[in-house]
From Swiss-Prot:
Keywords of the record: Actin-binding, Cytoplasm, Cytoskeleton, Nucleus
Domain ADF-H: 2-135
Subcellular location: Nucleus matrix; Cytoplasm, Cytoskeleton
PANTHER family xrefs: COFILIN-RELATED
SMART domains (alphabetical): ADF
Protein name: Cofilin-1A
Family the entry assigns: Belongs to the actin-binding proteins ADF family.
InterPro entries linked: ADF-H, ADF-H/Gelsolin-like_dom_sf, ADF/Cofilin
Role description: Controls reversibly actin polymerization and depolymerization in a pH-sensitive manner. It has the ability to bind G- and F-actin in a 1:1 ratio of cofilin to actin. It is the major component of intranuclear and cytoplasmic actin rods.
Amino acid sequence: MSSGIALAPNCVSTFNDLKLGRKYGGIIYRISDDSKEIIVDSTLPAGCSFDEFTKCLPENECRYVVLDYQYKEEGAQKSKICFVAWCPDTANIKKKMMATSSKDSLRKACVGIQVEIQGTDASEVKDSCFYEKCTKI
């Protein structure tokens, strides 16, 4: 289902800066105040901690996050690009519906995402959840 909400011009270029240049550790996207487009809200520095990522998730508002998730597996340092659809239970129902119906347009435009995670509360966006999903692939 598509909501008709467009992507701001810098959404994909900012993603490519993360994917190709490792310029960022994460990108936080949101729907603009006028509900017309998905915009880059902020970025996380390259090498940011997992705690920095979780602190950027608002308690009552939906966000999309692309995270360059760093982890160790069998002693080797690895990373995967994860897409997080953050839609907390406490968010406004209309905004949750809008965020859910708009997610695919951003997700499909960001070519190279390896893992997708949906979160409605803090228990679904723990480091252990990411690690489990990333090591299954």
